[in-house]
Amino acid sequence: VIGGDECNIN
């Protein structure tokens, strides 16, 4: 997933 919130793990 590119540009998805699911890849937003900070």
From Swiss-Prot:
Keywords: Blood coagulation cascade activating toxin, Disulfide bond, Fibrinogenolytic toxin, Hemostasis impairing toxin, Hydrolase, Protease, Secreted, Serine protease, Toxin. Its main location: secreted. The keyword Protease applies. One of its GO terms (molecular function) is serine-type peptidase activity. GO terms for cellular component: extracellular region. Strongly inhibited by PMSF. Not inhibited by EDTA, aprotinin, pepstatin, leupeptin, and bestatin. Expressed by the venom gland. It comes from the Eukaryota. It is found in: Secreted. Its EC number is 3.4.21.-. GO terms for biological process: proteolysis. Negative results: does not induce myotoxicity or hemorrhage, when injected intramuscularly. Is not lethal when administered either intravenously or intraperitoneally into mice (maximum dose tested is 20 ug). Monomer. Thrombin-like snake venom serine protease that coagulates human plasma and bovine fibrinogen by hydrolysis of the alpha chains (FGA) (minimum coagulation dose is 120 ug on fibrinogen). Has fibrinogenolytic activities, and degrades preferentially the Aalpha chain (FGA). Shows amidolytic activity toward N-benzoyl-L-Arg-p-nitroanilide, has a lower activity than Cdc SII. In vivo, intravenous injection induces defibrin(ogen)ation and a loss of the righting reflex and opisthotoxins, together with a typical gyroxin-like effect (18-20 minutes). Belongs to the peptidase S1 family. Snake venom subfamily. This is Thrombin-like enzyme Cdc SI.
